[in-house]
């Protein structure tokens, strides 16, 4: 019984992670700007509320 519950919880977590990954991939192709953990450059700047960190060249959230 405990094993079944663990498998169900693991399965739900896996489905959630997969759906988040697919959603992030779709957002990346739809937008002309970078969102969280997107590579940033002069050609593709970060979206509003995100800033490009020069050391890592990724967009991160900034208030």
Swiss-Prot record:
Taxonomy, superkingdom: Eukaryota
Provide the primary localization. Answer: secreted
Signal peptide location: 1-21
Q: Which Pfam families match?
A: Toxin_12
* Disulfide topology: 33-47, 40-52, 46-59
Cite the GO molecular-function annotations of the record: ion channel inhibitor activity; sodium channel regulator activity; toxin activity
Enumerate the propeptide ranges. 22-31
The subcellular localization recorded is: Secreted
Cellular component terms, GO, for this chain's entry? extracellular region
Q: Which UniProt keywords apply?
A: Disulfide bond, Ion channel impairing toxin, Knottin, Neurotoxin, Secreted, Signal, Toxin, Voltage-gated sodium channel impairing toxin
State if tRNA processing is listed as a keyword: no
Q: In which tissues is it expressed?
A: Expressed by the venom gland.
Tell me which family the UniProt entry assigns to this protein.
Belongs to the neurotoxin 10 (Hwtx-1) family. 36 (Jztx-2) subfamily.
Q: What role does this protein play?
A: Inhibits preferentially tetrodotoxin-insensitive sodium currents (Nav) on rat cardiac myocytes (IC(50) is 0.26 uM) and has weaker inhibition activity toward tetrodotoxin-sensitive sodium currents on rat dorsal root ganglion (DRG) sensory neurons (IC(50) is 0.83 uM) and on cockroach dorsal unpaired median (DUM) neurons (IC(50) is 1.19 uM). Has no significant effect on potassium currents on DRG neurons.
Domain text: The presence of a 'disulfide through disulfide knot' structurally defines this protein as a knottin.
| Entry protein name | U7-theraphotoxin-Cg1a
Native species of this protein? Answer: Chilobrachys guangxiensis (Chinese earth tiger tarantula)
């Amino acid at each position: 019984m405990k094993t079944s519950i663990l498998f169900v919880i693991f399965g739900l977590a896996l489905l959630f992670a997969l759906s988040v990954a697919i959603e992030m991939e779709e957002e990346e192709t739809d937008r002309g700007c970078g969102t969280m953990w997107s590579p940033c450059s002069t050609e593709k700047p970060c979206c509003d509320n995100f800033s490009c960190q020069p050391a890592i060249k990724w967009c991160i959230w900034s208030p």
